[in-house]
C-alpha cells in the first residue's frame, strides 16, 4: 500500500519549516512514494519549485512523484476579521484536487494577504 505525506512545511513556512523541496521530492522518490504535498503556512510560494522538482526527479530516476499543491491557512471566523479584536486563528489544511482547485486556492491565499492580513494572512 502506498503512503503519501499530505502535510509538509518547507523553507517557505517562516519559523516553522526547514525542509528543502528538492530534498523532500528526492526522498519521496527513494521511498517509492507516488506523491508528496507542500502545505506551507499561509503561502503558496513553493508550488513552482515543487512542480519543477517532481519533473526533474522523474527525468533523473524515471520515478514519477506527483506534486500535490496545498496550503495550511489561518482560518478565522468573520467577527475576528476586525482589527480591534484579538483574532481567533485556526489552522486549516487545504489541498487542491485539480487545476480549478489550485486556482481557487491561489485566490484564497492572495486575498488573505491583500484584504485580511493582520499579523498573519487570515482566510
Segments the model singles out, each with a brief description of its role:
Residues 1-123:
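Phosphodiester-processing cores and adjacent nucleic acid-binding clamps
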Amino acid at each position: 500500500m502506498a503512503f503519501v505525506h499530505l502535510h509538509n512545511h518547507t523553507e517557505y513556512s517562516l519559523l516553522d519549516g526547514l525542509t528543502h523541496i528538492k530534498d523532500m521530492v528526492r526522498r519521496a522518490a527513494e521511498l517509492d512514494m507516488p506523491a508528496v504535498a507542500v502545505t506551507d503556512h499561509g503561502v503558496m510560494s513553493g508550488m513552482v519549485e515543487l512542480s519543477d522538482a517532481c519533473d526533474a526527479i522523474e527525468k533523473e530516476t524515471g520515478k514519477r512523484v506527483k506534486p500535490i499543491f496545498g496550503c495550511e491557512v489561518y482560518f478565522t471566523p468573520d467577527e475576528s476579521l476586525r482589527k480591534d479584536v484579538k483574532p481567533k486563528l485556526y489552522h486549516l489544511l487545504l489541498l487542491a484536487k485539480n487545476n480549478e482547485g489550485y486556482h481557487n486556492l491561489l485566490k484564497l491565499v492572495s486575498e488573505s494577504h491583500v484584504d485580511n492580513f493582520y499579523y498573519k494572512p487570515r482566510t
